[in-house]
Amino acid sequence: MDLQNKPQILEHLHKSLTVTLYDCRWIPGTAKFVTLGSYARNTGCLQVYELEGPDLKTVKETEKKHSFKCGTFGASSLAERRLATGNFGGEVQIWDLENTAQPVFTAQAHASIVNAIDGCGGQAKGYGAPELATCGRDGCVRVWDVRQQDAPVAAFEPADPNNVRDCWCVAFGNSFNDNERCLLAGYDNGDVKMFDLRMNKVRWETNVRNGVCGLQFDRKDISMNKFAVCCLEAQFHVFDARTQHPKKGFASVSEKITAGATVWGAQHLPQNREVFMVSAGDGNLYLYKYHYPDQRKVKDHDGQELGVAGSVEMLNYKNISTQPVAGFDWSPDKEGLFACVAFDQAVRVGIVTKLNKV
């Protein structure tokens, strides 16, 4: 790709704050986004920002008892746009952003901090029940139906209670009809497990040898195509999920980012699933593109189908902070527009140009 046609990562707006930020999410169908974090006095901070010309306007700010760790709009309809959050007290809550005095849904999901949350089934184009998945330090992964808050609809707990691994991230996928749905979970010892929610069992598992900080399917609402797994020690892996071999599982390609920092997460572009942004612990954003191989599956000597991994190409990178980029989210409505938060207590809005040329 020549230099002229290369996508550029540009910072559009920058706002310094006095709160520690952990996550940010665009409100679907608007020019607004939500940031989630913690005030210095260990209380929760939920802020709504709006793009207004060359400025970033604070629309709403609310303080809650427990610091917020993560959030998602995945289980909410486009009409309601309700935000689901996980906090340091182990609670899952759903908020109506027009009235944040009381949550519309509360459940005690974990004994301590909710490390990650993901939602699925809320949008009109998706399939299946609107569900939230959470994971925590107790090693448990729990799935919640937003229409009932008394108990989780599924729970995957450690087999050995004496050897509990911290579960750091969860991600929904394979939700291409009303029955099928899968859930990925990543653990601090490098385990990656794929749970089949229809069968209620582990469908596949592997170990990537480094703690798993982030995971994402390229699309939630299609028959699973591929997913990214981000790790400590500057590594990430992309697994081809189309073909599962009975013994070898999914084929994968591994990549190391140059700086040697932790890879906090990978976010696939909503308008093009082959492009994804990797956020790193050195404050860099790396833009990658996945290239499929000529043949996506081959037959092994037993006649079983075996997946073939593609390759990843770094399109560009940009340093936007001196601290780790903890949260990153693409705008679902405007291609290339993104918001991100880093541990330097600042929120940034940026744009990636020329994505239509990749």
Swiss-Prot record:
Repeat listed as a keyword: yes
Pull one GO CC term from this UniProt entry. dynein axonemal particle
Task: Please name the GO terms that the record assigns under molecular function.
Answer: ubiquitin binding
Record SMART domains: WD40
What does gene deletion cause?
Mutants show ciliary loss with disappearance of axonemal dynein arms and diminishment of dynein arm heavy chains in the cytoplasm. They have reduced beat frequency and dyskinetic motion of the remaining ventral cilia.
Question: What Pfam families does UniProt report for this protein, alphabetically?
Answer: WD40 (PF00400)
Provide the coiled-coil residue spans. Answer: none
Q: What compartments host this protein?
A: Dynein axonemal particle
- Leader sequence range is none
| Identification of the protein by name | Dynein axonemal assembly factor 10
